[in-house]
Amino acid sequence: MTYVGMTPEGVSIALPPPVSAKLICGEDAPADGFTGVFPLLKSMGKLVRIKIYDKSRKLCFHGIVDEQKESCGGGRKLALAARSRAALLLDNEAVPQTYCMPSLSTIYEKHVKPYGFSECRGDGRAFNGTLTVTKGMSEWQAAAAFCSRFLKITPRAADGVFDASGGRPQGKLVFDNAGGIAYTSVCIDNRYCDYLSEVLVKSGTSGVYSLAARSETAVSLGIRRRRCLTEGDADTLIRSAEKKAFRVTADCPGEVPADLFMDAEVRDAALGAVEHLYVSQMEYSLGANGEKTSFILRR
């Protein structure tokens, strides 16, 4: 990894190799996060941005510095904590309003583009219905609410792009100690406690709750766990529960370049082949024991 700090004036400053570092991005967190400690020869002045490039010189993180610490005593150190641009959508409150026949392009122009995003991907047509942005909602919550309700998609904000297309990056990660990506450990985690067997939804006219979605996987496992909704998408709730109930973790030595949502597969002599996975979370870390990349894979 190569690290470059940026001053408020836009001047780039190459940072020395860090003593420790952690870079994490995942589908469940809108903003990617970085923390790092660097050796310090003299004060760097104010750093407001940080860029991180992987070993192929690809930009893998462009973040806003949330906290900068310079210290001496026990060694001179520069500590940085940063989040990706999506943090601006989390930190800013949306103006309460109601949209009639909302569209992705309208939501993007109002709630996302003003914070430095340059591109929007997804279905731009207008939808029947209304979207209400209530007091206290963040810009991210407003944009994500539209995507969830009308597009049935969880958006992703990265590299200046607000992506609500549902597309996945090309390529596939194959974790295999006999010819693929080497790993030090793999764990298959079945969390049966997270499954929902059925979801009932309340009728708007009669007020009666009726079955709206069922998980055949949960039923086949003998699981009975029901939820009742007054409003919301029952299928999305079932799918979300199924996704949380199964994951594979893989720890790999060194730096492993990858993209979120990339297809993945694990092959192990004892555990067998685990297919039809995708990258749900990636974490690169550097410390006293060297560097490693950890993955959470889901279906």
Q: Regions from the language model: what does each represent?
A:
Residues 1-94, 148, 156, 170-172, ...:
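Assembly/oligomerization scaffold segments
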Residues 1-9, 39-70, 101-114, 253-276, ...:
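Short, acidic/charged, Gly/Pro-enriched secondary-structure junctions
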Residues 1-9, 20, 67, 82, ...:
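Solvent-exposed, well-ordered amphipathic alpha-helical segments
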Residues 1-2, 42, 56, 144, ...:
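Acidic, small/polar-enriched beta strand-loop surface segments
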Residues 10, 28, 66-76, 101-110, ...:
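Phosphate-binding glycine-rich loops and adjacent basic patches that engage nucleotide phosphates
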Residues 15-18, 71-80, 107-115, 199-209, ...:
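Short, functional N-terminal and low-complexity linear motifs
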Residues 72, 77-192:
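Charged- and aromatic-enriched interaction segments used to assemble
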